[in-house]
C-alpha cells in the first residue's frame, strides 16, 4: 500500500494520498489551502489516478481546495452530513472572526458530494476505509481507518500481518487533542469520541493526524496528558487542544 502526503497552506494541514501502490487509483484525504498543485505533482510522481476525496471534517483548512480539485477530475467528495454546510459556507464552522480571513473568496459545494455514515465503510480505489463518526472537534468529524501491510524494522513486508492506520483529522494529535471552541465543538464529546473510537484500537495503530507528525495509539495512551485516566466512562479535567481550525 502507498500512503504519502504533505502539509498544505499556512495551517500546514496534512493532505494524504492513499493507493494500493504506484500506478493505481488513489484517494485524496483533506486537500487544504494551496494543495492542488502539490497534489498534481505527487499524483504524477507515483502515476496515480484520483478517484475520490475524503474529508475528515469540514473546517476550511482541510477542505480549502476540495471543490476545485474534485470538480477538475470529476470525482466525488465524501463528508459527514454534520459538516457538509461548511463546503459552501466555511464561516459556519469557524465563526465570524476566523471567517474574516476568507476575504472575498467564494466557496461552492463540489458537483458530487456523498454523505458519510457512521460505521458504514466505503471502498474506493480498491481499499476499504472504515468510517467512524467522532464528533467533538466538529459536529461531523470522521476517523478513517485502513488495514495496511505490516513492515519490519528494515521496511520489508511481514507476510500475513497488517497494521491499522487511522486518519483522524483534528481529533487526536501527538501529545494533544483537537480544539473545541469553534461552532459545533464540545470538549466532553471529543473525549467521548476518543474513548469510544480511538482508544479501543491496538497500541500499534498508526495515527496520521490533520496536523503535525504521525503517532501511535500506544504512545498517546501512555503519554498524552489529555488522555490520562480516560476510558469509556471517565474523562479528565477539561483542557483545550492546540492545533488546527
Each model region followed by its residue ranges:
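Short Gly/Pro-enriched turn/cap motifs at secondary-structure boundaries
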Residues: 6-8, 111-113, 133-137
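Short catalytic-loop micro-motif centered on adjacent basic/acidic residues
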Residues: 26-29, 52-55, 133
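Metallo-beta-lactamase
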Residues: 34, 92-98, 121, 128-133, ...
Amino acid at each position: 500500500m502507498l500512503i504519502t502526503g504533505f502539509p498544505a497552506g499556512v495551517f500546514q494541514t496534512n493532505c494524504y494520498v492513499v493507493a494500493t501502490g504506484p500506478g493505481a487509483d488513489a484517494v485524496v484525504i483533506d486537500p487544504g489551502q494551496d494543495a492542488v498543485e502539490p497534489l498534481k505533482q505527487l499524483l504524477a510522481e507515483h502515476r496515480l489516478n484520483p478517484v475520490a476525496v475524503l474529508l475528515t471534517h469540514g473546517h476550511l483548512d482541510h477542505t480549502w481546495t476540495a471543490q476545485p480539485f474534485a470538480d477538475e477530475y470529476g470525482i466525488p467528495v465524501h463528508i459527514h452530513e454534520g459538516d457538509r454546510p461548511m463546503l459552501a459556507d466555511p464561516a459556519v464552522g469557524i465563526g465570524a472572526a476566523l471567517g474574516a480571513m476568507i476575504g472575498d473568496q467564494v466557496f461552492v459545494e463540489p458537483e458530487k458530494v456523498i454523505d458519510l455514515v457512521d460505521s458504514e465503510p466505503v471502498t474506493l480505489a480498491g481499499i476499504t476505509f472504515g468510517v467512524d463518526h467522532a464528533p467533538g472537534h466538529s459536529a461531523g468529524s470522521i476517523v478513517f481507518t485502513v488495514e495496511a501491510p505490516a513492515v519490519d524494522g528494515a521496511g520489508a513486508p511481514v507476510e500475513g500481518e497488517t497494521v491499522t492506520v487511522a486518519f483522524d483529522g483534528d481529533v487526536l494529535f501527538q501529545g494533544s487533542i483537537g480544539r473545541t471552541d469553534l461552532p459545533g465543538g464540545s470538549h466532553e464529546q471529543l473525549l467521548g469520541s476518543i474513548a469510544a473510537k480511538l482508544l479501543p484500537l491496538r497500541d500499534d495503530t498508526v495515527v496520521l493526524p490533520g496536523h503535525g507528525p504521525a503517532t501511535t495509539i500506544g504512545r498517546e495512551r501512555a503519554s498524552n496528558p489529555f488522555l490520562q485516566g480516560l476510558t469509556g466512562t471517565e474523562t479528565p479535567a477539561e483542557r483545550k487542544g492546540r492545533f488546527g481550525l
